[in-house]
Design a protein with these regions (language model features):
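Short, surface-exposed "cap/lid" segments of acyl-processing enzymes
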Residues: 27-68
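Gly/Ala-rich beta-loop-alpha elbow adjacent to hydrolase catalytic centers
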Residues: 110-119
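N-terminal cap/lid segment of alpha/beta-hydrolase-fold proteins
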Residues: 1-29
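Short alpha-helix in the alpha/beta-hydrolase fold that links the catalytic acid
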Residues: 156, 170-179
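Alpha/beta-hydrolase active-site loop
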Residues: 81-101
Length: 216
């Protein structure tokens, strides 16, 4: 971070109480807002995950106001794990807070692994409510475990980034889903990368940067 960048811890009001969050932004007025959702809470996923912080930093450096937060039951956030359903409510509460702080700015919505399911569900709800995100960015979506087929409209472009050597999410399942889903995502395959993109975070950040509102 530069001296002009800001990072602040904040408490949001979620459906089950407090949501622990971090807001980052660069110098000046943000040109877009972003939210990045973290991986599975029951397997150590938090807003401090490296994929999450990499995407957040990319948004901040591009001039966005980016929010990452702990889902219910994680860290200091109140509540208990809810299989992606309650976590979607958490996301919508975070989006409402962010859009109130910077009304009218386009929203870049992202999620990693479990967080991509939450982000996709949230994107559909926002679209149904007439407030679609500008872009939905899904990293390693666990299509083998969660019902992504029920998410058939987000009213925004979708990018899917999938590592070819993913040891958690079967890559071929993601590739097949990406071809069949009506979301018609832009599929980016990352070779020589595992689920957590160890040693491959820079290529991930480069893809994300090319999909931010100012780059489209």
């Amino acid at each position: 971070m530069t001296a002009s960048d800001t990072r602040q811890t904040c408490d949001l009001q979620g459906p089950e109480g407090r949501l622990e969050a971090v807001l980052e932004k660069g110098e000046g007025t943000p040109t877009f807002c972003a939210i990045v959702c973290h991986p599975h809470p029951l397997f150590g996923g938090t807003m401090g995950n490296k994929v999450v912080t990499t995407l957040s930093r990319t948004c901040r450096e591009a001039g966005g106001a980016v929010l990452r937060f702990n889902f219910r039951g994680v860290g200091k956030s109140q509540g208990a794990y809810s299989d992606g359903l309650g976590e979607t409510e958490d996301l919508l509460a975070a989006e409402a807070w962010l859009s109130h702080a910077w009304p009218g700015l386009p929203l870049w919505l992202a999620g990693f692994s479990f967080g991509s399911f939450v982000a996709a569900r949230g994107a559909r709800i926002l679209a149904d409510n007439g407030r679609p995100a500008r872009h939905l960015f899904l990293v390693a979506p666990p299509v083998h475990h969660y019902d992504f087929n029920s998410i058939d409209n987000t009213a925004c472009p979708v990018t899917v980034v999938q590592s070819e050597d993913d040891e958690v999410v079967p890559a071929e399942d993601v590739f097949q889903w990406a071809v069949q889903t009506p979301l018609a995502p832009d599929l980016i395959r990352v070779p020589d990368a595992g689920h957590f993109f160890h040693g491959r975070l820079i290529p991930l950040a480069e893809v994300a940067r090319s999909r931010l509102p100012g780059a489209l």
